[in-house]
Amino acid sequence: MYLDTAIIVKLLVDEHDTDYFQNALAGALLSSSELAFTEVRAALLTKERNKLISASQRDAAWQVFTDRVLTRDIDLHPLNGLVLRKANHILWRCHPTVPLRTLDAIHTAACDLSQDFPLCTTDKRMRDAARVLGIPVFPEDQPS
């Protein structure tokens, strides 16, 4: 199962749907892009700046993430030219129906190239793009 960064963050810090995703993803083979390494750090720093987590919670969440990557509990696929070219193709394919953002296109491309389906995301644009491309999404019942 390919996780977008927002889902990874839900596994690291308490959000309204953290329990749901922790239970739903327990025991699944998880992957993402190397892009998540930078995006997770940025998301944790944003949560700290917005006073949603403390510095110690930020550090603990980062440690859990890096441990999960090092143990390959979350496998990070390389970010390379092939992924970027695929993301460019996805942007073109989804236009004008789905106004996909650049980093979301990169995640969608990495998911498609790795074939680590389904794409686990709650982002409406990513879910809509995945449907255009025929990529299975999770959770299935999330409104788009």
Residue ranges, per PLM feature:
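PIN-domain endoribonuclease scaffold, especially VapC-family toxins
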Residues: 22-31, 35-102, 106-109, 114, ...
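Conserved glycosyltransferase catalytic-site signature
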Residues: 5, 103-105, 123
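Alpha-helix/helix-capping structural signal
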Residues: 6-7, 35, 124-125
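Short, hydrophobic beta-strand segments that form beta-sheet elements in well-ordered domains
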Residues: 118-121
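Short, polar loop motifs at secondary-structure junctions
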Residues: 14, 123-126
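Metal-dependent nucleic-acid phosphoesterase active-site entry motif
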Residues: 1-18
